[in-house]
Amino acid sequence: MASSVSLGSAGPADDLALKVTPPRVPRHLVGRPRLLASDERYRDRPVILVQAPAGFGKTSLLAQWRLEHLAQGAVVAWLSAHPQHDRPRFLQSLALAVAVGAARPTFGHTLLDGAVPPGLEGVTIWLAELAQTALDVVLIVDEADRLPTDAREALAYLLRNAPPNLRTIVAARADCALDVDD
C-alpha cells in the first residue's frame, strides 16, 4: 500500500508534487526562434503573459523557456495551476515549486506546514522569503485561467509586489482575468 506525505492539515503532498513537476520537452518540437526567452522583447520583463486559446502550444513554449532559463543559471519554479488551488493551496504550491526548483527543501516551510495566514498575508510572507534568498527565480505558472478567483487575486498581488529577483511567466487562455497594472 502506498503512503503519502501530509502537509499539515491541508492534505496529501502528492497532488502538489505533480503540479510543480514541469513537463518534458519533446525532441521533435519545432523551435520558434522569434519566441526565444532570450529575445530582447522578453529578456528584462518582470512579468510575461502568454495568452492563446487551448492547443496553441503555450505549455510547450513555457517548457522551452524553462530550459533556456536553466541554461542561463536561473532557478526555475514551475506550477501547473488547478481549479482546486484555492488561495491556501496555491500558496503551498508556490512554496513547493520554489523548494523543488531551487533544491531548498526548507523554503516556504511555514506555508507547507499548513499555517497559511488569511487574506494576502501569505503571499507577502512568500515574497519576503523569496526576496531574502540570493537566487534569481523565474516562476512559471501554466494554465492560470484554471485558478479560482481568490488564487487569481493572490497571483495578481504577487505580480504587483514581486521583488527584483523574481521574474514571472504566466500562461492562460484568452479568458484569464488578472488585475495587474501594465
Where on the chain are the PLM-derived regions?
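Structural recognition of the conserved hydrophobic beta-strand(s) that form the central parallel beta-sheet
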Residues: 138-142, 166-173
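Walker A (P-loop) ATP-phosphate-binding motif of ABC ATPase nucleotide-binding domains
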Residues: 47
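Conserved phosphate-binding/catalytic loops and adjacent sensor/switch elements of nucleotide-binding enzymes
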Residues: 56, 60-136, 144-146
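Conserved ATPase-coupling elements of RecA-like P-loop NTPase cores
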Residues: 146-155, 180
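Short regulatory helix/loop adjacent to the ATP-binding pocket of P-loop NTPases
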Residues: 174-182
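Conserved catalytic/switch belt of AAA+ P-loop NTPases
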Residues: 156-164
